[in-house]
Amino acid sequence: MAIDVDRTLAVLRRKLEALGYSDPLEPASLQLVQKLVEDLVHTTDSYTAVKQQCAKQAQEIAAFDTRLESVRQDSVRLQSENSQLHVLVMQHAERHEREAREHYTAVKRLEDTIAELSYWKHAAAEKLASADKENAGLRKRCEELAKLTDRLASGAATPQSVAPKISSRSPIRVAPPPSPPRPRQATVDVLQAANGRILSLQRQLADATAELQELRQRVAEDEDQIRRRDVEIDRLGTRAGTDTNVLALRARNEANESMILQLNGTVESLAARVRELEAVEVRCEELQGALRRAEMDRDQAEERYSRSARDHDALSREVLGLRRDLAALQDTNNRAAGLLAADAAGASTPDTTAGAPALRQRLADSRADVERLSGQLAAADMERRNLAQQLSALRSELDDTQFLLAEAQSRAAGLAAAQAVAESEARRLAGEAAAREGRLRELDSQLAVVLSDLEARQAGFAALEKDRAEANARAEELARRLDEVERSAASERAAAAAAQQSVSRLDSELRVVRGSAAALEAEAAALRQELQDVSVGKVRATSALSSTEDEAVRARQQAEALRMQLTAERRAAEELRAGHDTLQLEVDRLGGQLALQQQEAELLRQQLAAARGELAASEAAASGAEQKLSGLGALSQRLEEMGEQARRAQAATAEAEAEAVRLRAAVSEAKEGQARAERGLREARREVEGAREAEALVRAQLREVEAQAEGTSKALKAAEADRDRALMDARLAAGDLASLRDQLAAETSSAADAGSTARQMAARLSAAERAAAAAQEERERAAVAAEEAEAAAAAARGREEEARAQGREWAERARRAEALVAEYEADVAQLRAARDSDAAALRSLEDTVAAARRDLDARRSEVEQLTTLSLRGDATVQEYMANLKAMSTDLRAAEMRAADLAGEAAAAQDAAASWRSEAEQLRGLLRQMDADRDNLQHELDAKAERLVAQEQQLAGAQAAEQEAARLLALAEGRLALTDNRAREGEAEAAAVRAQLAAALDSVRALSGEGEALREELRAVSEDLEALVRENQVVGGELAAVAAQRDSAAEEARRLGGRRASAEQLLRAKEAEAEDLRRVYEALAAEHRRLQGGVGALEREGAMREAALQAKAAEVSSLAESQRAAQATINQYVMDLQAFERQVDSLSRQLSQAEADGEELVRQREALLEEIRAAQQVRLGLERHREELQRQVASLDSQVAIGRARLEDSNSEAASLNQRLAMERSRVAELEGLLAGMRAREFRSDFASDRAGGQLAVMVDRNRALEEQVASLQHQVGALQASREAQDRELSRLRGEALALAASTAASLEGRTAAAGGAAAGAAKDQAAALDRLTSERDAAQDEAARLRGALAAAEAAAASASTAAAVSIPAAGSGSEAAAVLRVRCSELERRNTELMQELRTLQDTCRQQESLLSAAQNELSALQAEHRRLVELVARLDQDKAAAAAEAAAARQQVATATRRVATAEQEAAAGAARLQSQLRDEQGRRRQAERDFLELLSSIEGAGGEAAAAAVAAAHGEGAAELASRRLRELQTQVDALEAEKAGLEEATQRTRATLGAMSGQMAAIQAEYDATNTALAGLAGAMAAGAQGQGQVQGPAGTAPAAAAGAPGPQPGQAQAGGFGGAHGGGSISLSGGPRR
């Protein structure tokens, strides 16, 4: 039993020695001490387990808080997005209503146009029918006149039937019914074109209506989704309640939304300006089309005028000939009447009486001839007037039809533009749906993470409740046991000393733990702050992911636009294929007709060889086609641009996808790094919380856990509501995802179809070449047919000459006809020369129009570039603002982390190393992706080159086909002309034969009449020889008159034939002109369509280029710092303002070409633009003020943290004072106890041992005091770090104040007084913020003074403790060696304390230096305020001198230079501050290492020989920790210095890029100005050409108007003359009266 007791006692002593208790132990107190030791061990183990559980729960709660914060931020973001969607829906609804109104008006206009075209169609048909009827009547009249002339010549009609016009002895012959009139081909073509246009407009109207219905349905669906989303958000908002963070985020989102709305307003104003410019361009195109139509009309009118002039000259010559014949007949009549009167007066023989009836018969015949010729003359005049009226009516109808066609084309163009706008809106809605789908997916993933965390936390909460119950039970058990210990100590005096020592040790440990509780709570607060920083980093990653998803959405939109473009190109290819098939059918149809045109084919072969030579000499087949058709050159350029745009779009899509993948990988890696950091933090928390051994802290933590559990339960409910909402959104977005996948598959198939289309085009090209060869053979056959037709015409001419040779009396008329033909040929040559000159003028006008069109295209491209630049600027501003906010958040987080995370440097270094490795991996991945992108780009370039080659081949084939079609049309026209000429020759030959037969009949009739006269003369020859001679003379004259009459009739017939041929030629020319007009109209329409397509492709290319540049800017901006971003933003704001002024000036310059009535509208728009710019400046200043307010709030939080720390230090100082007082009282009690025990029970050696135990207690107390001094030093260092952070914040605020002053001075120079007031308000706000910072700095200085006082009190307490130890040592015994050693060690401790005081004084000196630096910063701030006031005064003066534009520009440049210098000064100050901080850091680190070494030496000297090994181990552990901490801290600072240098380099690079951008913009503006001048010159030339064309048209219409007047006025005198002649004849004849004169 004794052995067991001894063994148990030995084991217990070893345990007590392990616990640091070396006093002797009696066997009587064995059980009690063993029980106490077991309870202590059990309590320690339980406390450790509870502490670990609490740490785990705290970590879980922190993680849950982080996730809850992210969920809140997502909720705020969704609310902001909802508000944006509301704005978009309102805008979309307004746009939809506007489009609906425009569509309704367009439909009404189209209906009116269709009705008007239908009316004009019917009117034209009726006019054509009436014209054909009149023509048939005139032909019938001509035929009747010809037949009447033939009857008169043949003698079938008597003079009585001709002379009177009322009565006739012979019955009137009924003419055969005329053939039905045949409408002209030109009229039929015009009607067909009008019908086709009406049908196309109806189809377009139906398509537009269907698209409008579809858009309305989509808008309704979007509105329903948004409404459901609003309801869900409102429900969640009512359940979750409001939070300060939510309110702050709402305010920030409202500011962002205001900025976005302002930028949207700027973009809308620029877009409105662009639309106005496009309207001006459309107006110019309409004027060009009108000019071309006017030129064509002028050519047609000139041609018709020349024809009418030729007809008028021919009719005039015929009228003159008829007048001469009429005068000769009248003279002959008068002479015959005189002779008859003389014969009647002197005749007395029966022979004379017998010859008188014959003479009267001849006289009546001559009078009938005169009357007939007068009637023919009047009919010819009437026909000429009718032809003139018909010509004017047709001309007016043609003008009306052309005007209606132009108006219909313009309306169709407007409808197509509206359709394009609707398509763009549909694409935008699809992009928004895709963005919403991505957000829903993100919310779903976050909800899943939150649910898993909630489940884990619920399990942890249950375990925590169990552990808390166990800890409470153990605490109660411990209290009970402590009571038992106290009772046993009172009953057992023998073990009182050991019990008191154990209790005092436990009390000291509890006090130490309580003292360290505040420090641990501060560390916990620091860790919470770090968690907040991590959450902020997560928010940044989320924002980066959202921006990446936005880029992906834009890429999808670009892909959608590319798909639409490919669809349009496929449609165009289908149209080309249909046109090719139609052409092939036309060629096959013409194959049978061109079998006889061999001679024409030879000429066409030569032309084809020349064209092939030109095509072989040129670089592209499109140039030759452009020279021949003057319209197809833009097609090759458009195809090349389309290929380039396709390559760019594919590259942009690939880059966007690669960037999205890269950003997703970066986000995932960031999440992994965050997880590693969280693990490191958890490990650090476990290590820190291993030192907590107090029950009170456990209970406090348990209370905190309960509060957090309640908050977690609330957050769990909110998360469940979020989960329900996210699930509902996910179900709604599933359909959208499926539709987007289908669209992607369709795009892939469309790309494959494009490749197959290119191959099909190549095949069609070879088919077209074969068709061209077949057409050449057909042309050869047509040439043979033309030769045969010419041979037939030559034969007809030979027959005509033979007929002329047979009729001797027609020789003179034939010569006159030849003379007329020569005159006609001369007129034709003159007309050809005039036509050539007009063609040259037309070509020059076409060149002018082409130059104007090129200028307009350049202007359009410039406007689109400006629009792209503005869009790019807006996107860059938004990105910069987002990056600025993120960077400001990062900066504040970094400062707080640098101030609070000194103890967690090792984990941060590991995380930094892991991040570096991840960054290297990302760089390698980026390099690999760049290589893949280069390979893909190379493949795309190769494919694009092949596509361009194929497109060039296709363009060449199309040009060849169109050339072949043109040549075929010319051949058809020539063939038709040859046929008409052949028919005319045959008709003329038939007319000659008829005339010859009539002449032979008249000759036979005259010969018979001559025989009768000879018989009568032979009967009376014996008595009236003189009368016979006179009768012979009269007979000869009558024969001459009859010959003249016959010749006049023949001439009338010939003129009728020529008139018919002229009419046929006129119809052929009109048909050819109509064909040419249709061809030119088709070419013009195709050209306009191609121009529209080119413009659309250019705009799409610009949008893609803008998207690519925005992506590149975003990638580069991720590596920039806050100062670089701020400087770049300020510089860009100034550039944007200058650019807006340049845009305004350019718009004003462009608007000078418009009408004077629009001047007021332009001024109003300029004023509105200035007001918007002023509002933008005001909003920018407000944003700066809000940013300063947020910074001030962050400084307030930092000051509050400092104050809390100061309060903690004060409380710790108070606790130290209390401990010192307690220690003094306990020392006194121990001294009394020792004296009593010395006097009563113990020996001197036992007293010396007791004194050694008390010395050990004092050593422990001194160690605790030194630890407290070290904690105070740490707090002093933390305060210094916080002061340094405040100094950095002040320097940053100083830089921002400088940048704000520069931006304010640059932006307010050209603005209104309201902007100046806003700037002054912002300056006042900034001054107030700086004053507030100054007051806070003073408060921080006061707190530092208080802390120094607390440190002095702590040092005094340490000194008193050392004095107490020194006093207690002699009381133990003067002869003891331990007392001497203790005195030496206490003296060393005092010396070390003195050194620590010197170090504290050094720190105080450093604080004074910092105060001096703060005073210098205040001085600089006052200087900046003075500079700001000076700038405000300068702005006021500039507002007064607003008219001086040059001075304003110089001041702006000066302000830019000042801002640059200030930025450089700020950079230098930042570098100097960084170097100063680095030097201070090195000094502080050296001092700290020295203090640690001294402290370790002090500990080793105090503990003595017995504890040298343990002290050495502790010193080694502390030394290694300090060295590692110092090295890591140094590496972190070096990393920060490197980051600052990198930021400086980035700032310099951004400044250089900005300057280069400014230079490029100035060059672009100079080029734009030059092109604008060239455009003005071209427009002036075009206006002059239009004026000249209008003047020439007026001149043409003037003669054309006078000619009908002359034609109408010319016949007036002729009847008068005929009447006069008639009356003269009557008076000359005595009793003879003409029936034509008096009866009329």
Curated annotation (Swiss-Prot):
Keyword set, alphabetical order: Coiled coil, Cytoplasm, Cytoskeleton, Microtubule
GO molecular function: identical protein binding; microtubule binding; protein homodimerization activity
InterPro entries, alphabetized: Centriole_BasalBody_StrucProt
Compositionally biased intervals (Pro residues): 174-183
Any one GO cellular component localisation term in the record: centriole
Stated role: Microtubule-binding protein essential for cytoskeletal organization (e.g. rootlet microtubule bundles) and flagellar basal body/centriole assembly.
Record text about domains: Coiled-coil domains are critical for microtubule binding via the formation of a two-stranded coiled-coil structure in homodimers.
Name under which the protein is recorded: Basal body protein 10
Species of origin: Chlamydomonas reinhardtii (Chlamydomonas smithii)
Name of the gene: BLD10
